[in-house]
Amino acid sequence: VVADNPQLIDINMISNGPGGGGGGPGGGGGDWFHVNGVAYNEDLDQIAFSSRFASEIYIIDHSTTTAEAASHSGGNSGMGGDILYRWGNPSNYNMSGNQTIPSAVHDVRWIKDDGRPNGGFLQIFNNKGVSNNQSTVDGIDAPIDPNNPYNYYRAVGQPFGPSSFTTRYVCAYSAPGQSASDRMYNGNIFVNASGGQGGAGVMYEVDQNGTIVWGPYNADTQKAFRYECEHPGIVSLQPFMNSTATTSCFS
């Protein structure tokens, strides 16, 4: 029974995905799942990934051995290669509940838990979070299992929580596909609304009030990243900067 096993993927859950085929791998619908974002959490030793066609995000255990990953036990979570957490579309495992990711989703990542606002939350670019023409950047506070800090709580017979996003920024510029976002140490949100598939094609940064404080700059990119000034790679560039050049880091 699919609903009794949300820790597993139902290969028939995407019956007619945009990848061009009716569920399951291979054939004309070989891109039936379309994973487009992967993030690693070193503290938890876990991996998160997002599926564009499933309209869902997932977490799996990275601490397992190869043998454990092929089973249902082992690793820090004790669940082997099973799905530890999933969010966005409970109908994928035959449960009722809010479909919080109505269509495409991209660039799942953990917000760094280093003192910045909402540290430890998952963050996604929800391409059609409000409507077909309105994207959002959503934060999700995944509920930790009180009996195992490497697992996630789910009430029996209920979908994984929370029932809705924990935080949301409604994008000033939207994109129906691709795209990325990140949370800066000061709480600002970096947004890259991709130019592909008719998107805005800009990148910009907003403060915690939603006011644009950097950009928007034209950027016909699929996914962009904003590195903070303290990043070791940025710091190492300082000796090589032209003395007449100015940047937001070396002004």
Kindly give the residue locations of the regions a language model identified.
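Histidine-/acidic-rich catalytic cores in large beta-rich domains
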Residues: V1-S251
